[in-house]
Swiss-Prot record:
Keywords tagged on the record: Disulfide bond, Secreted, Signal, Toxin
Name this polypeptide is given: Neurotoxin-like protein pMD18-NTL1/2/4/5
Taxonomic superkingdom: Eukaryota
Subcellular location: Secreted
Family: Belongs to the three-finger toxin family. Short-chain subfamily. Orphan group IX sub-subfamily.
Tissue specificity annotation: Expressed by the venom gland.
CC per GO annotation: extracellular region
GO MF annotations, alphabetized: toxin activity
Signal peptide: 1-21
PROSITE patterns per UniProt: SNAKE_TOXIN (PS00272)
InterPro entries xref list: Snake_3FTx (IPR003571), Snake_toxin-like_sf (IPR045860), Snake_toxin_con_site (IPR018354), Toxin_cobra-type (IPR054131)
Length: 86
């Protein structure tokens, strides 16, 4: 009986996601938008947008830090909620 109980406890722990995993939108031009599961150390979702050759470019994903540098007309947005980088 103890062996069965121990086996059930081990299986339960192995099957549960013991940590919270953030999801962020990724890619740039897919419709509908796709998401990705971020690694444990990734706390931010980001969205970079800029104009190149007269066309708006967008990049989305997970990030360890939030880059706040805006250069060459590049706009960077960071957030901490799931799928907040739409």
């Amino acid at each position: 009986m103890k062996t069965l109980l121990l086996t059930l406890v081990v299986l339960t722990i192995a099957c549960l996601d013991l940590g919270y995993t953030k999801t962020c939108f990724n890619d740039d031009l897919t419709n509908p938008k796709t998401t990705e599961l971020c690694r444990h150390s990734m706390y931010f979702c980001f969205k970079n947008s800029w104009i190149a050759g007269g066309v708006e470019r967008i990049e989305r994903g997970c990030s360890l830090t939030c880059p706040d540098i805006k250069y060459n007309g590049k706009y960077i947005y960071c957030c901490t909620r799931d799928n907040c980088n739409a």
